């Protein structure tokens, strides 16, 4: 039986073959579900997550209030950049994880850039 592979999954695999993160310049990867947004900085060499932020995290839950999904994505980007700065991370490689660079994905990236991360 053939496996069903979506175009997003194909795009994701193609992108992941080309980019990887290191400790000095980790990979900023995002995932979005219908309701939540997740972002993390990954060191692919060591196979470790350095920083992780999501709309489900306790720190952001109280801050979000009645934000729409795009507004919540901006808060995730800001919180991720703040946590990265605290760990001494200035530059990242952006991995949109096969999602279109539009809407919530763009909001996370823009907020992280405004907060000081360099892509």
Curated annotation (Swiss-Prot):
One of its GO terms (cellular component) is cytosolic large ribosomal subunit. The keyword RNA-binding applies. One of its GO terms (molecular function) is 5S rRNA binding. Coiled coil: none annotated. GO terms for biological process: translation. It holds the Pfam family Ribosomal_L18p. The keyword Zinc does not apply. Keywords: Ribonucleoprotein, Ribosomal protein, RNA-binding, rRNA-binding. InterPro entries: Ribosomal_uL18_bac-type, Ribosomal_uL18_bac/euk. Part of the 50S ribosomal subunit; part of the 5S rRNA/L5/L18/L25 subcomplex. Contacts the 5S and 23S rRNAs. This is one of the proteins that bind and probably mediate the attachment of the 5S RNA into the large ribosomal subunit, where it forms part of the central protuberance. NCBIfam families: L18_bact (TIGR00060). Belongs to the universal ribosomal protein uL18 family. HAMAP family: Ribosomal_uL18_B. This is Large ribosomal subunit protein uL18. The gene is rplR.
